[in-house]
Amino acid sequence: MAEKLPAPLLALFAPRPPLRYLPPMDVPPEKRSTPRVSGIAKYLKYAQSHDQQYHPTESLEEKRLRLRDEKQKQQRERLRSMIKVWDPDHDRHVIGDPYKTMFLSRLSYDTKESDIEREFTRYGPIERIRVVRNKVTGKSMGYAFVVFERERDLKVAYKASAGLMLNGRRIVVDVERGRTVKGWLPRKLGGGLGGRHYTKERPRRERGSRFRGDSGFRGGYRGGFRKSSGGGSRFGRGPTRSSHSSDYGGRDSSPKRRRYN
């Protein structure tokens, strides 16, 4: 077949010349030599005599845990020292009868004594109002004390001011507990009744089945709406189609449902 082709086409089918030989760049496989693998018995002497000058490097996780423990220890020591010196009975800023004093918390930081007086003077005459401020910056700490002249005015104000809005914030009212409750500690010393309750873990609710056993349903998607064997529906809503057929001579007078294929 090839001999019938013309010469120009036969030149296209001619074999190509062989590739030029180049010496290999790598070592031949038969001449390769790899390091010999030996056991670890000769290294046991180094494990028996530990280097006393070696100090292990502290990882980032170990450093984080160490700093956390040190910070917690300092916090506990600071609380112990503050509890020792805390004495509300001999505080020069605490003035007035403790049973006539109301405690206000969650105040707006721009609330002044005049705002509190305008809001609580309706319940009775006020002897003294003190908004606790920072000793260094002079800014409000968000809580205050109101001393009434009569104890009954305190009780009326305590009941009427629950959930009161003052300067756009809903405040919390309570009686003074520092001098009336034995062993009471404020929140800054680890006690108190305050705090943001939404940060606490809520109790988990038990999740049961979607369908209860006392609901009268069979469960699943049918819901238990099936016909009973007594000739009527299960819920007693009248006779079934078979009873209509027996009353009218075998002919069903109930409306037919159109079926769509």
From Swiss-Prot:
Keywords: mRNA processing, mRNA splicing, Nucleus, Ribonucleoprotein, RNA-binding, Spliceosome
Superkingdom of origin: Eukaryota
Disordered as annotated region, ranges: 192-261
Cellular component, GO, one term: nucleus
Segments forming domain RRM: 100-178
Molecular-function GO term, any one: mRNA binding
CDD domains in alphabetical order: RRM_snRNP70
A single BP term in Gene Ontology: mRNA splicing, via spliceosome
Subcellular location: Nucleus
Main location class: nucleus
Pfam families named in the record: RRM_1 (PF00076), U1snRNP70_N (PF12220)
Compositional bias (Gly residues): 216-235
Composition bias, Basic and acidic residues: 198-215
InterPro entries, alphabetized: Nucleotide-bd_a/b_plait_sf (IPR012677), RBD_domain_sf (IPR035979), RRM_dom (IPR000504), snRNP70_RRM (IPR034143), U1_U11-U12_snRNP_70-35kDa (IPR051183), U1snRNP70_N (IPR022023)
Function field: Involved in nuclear mRNA splicing. Essential for growth.
Description of how the protein assembles with itself and partners: Component of the spliceosome, where it is associated with snRNP U1. Associates with U1 snRNA.
The protein, known as: U1 small nuclear ribonucleoprotein 70 kDa homolog
Gene source species: Schizosaccharomyces pombe (strain 972 / ATCC 24843)
The encoding gene: usp101
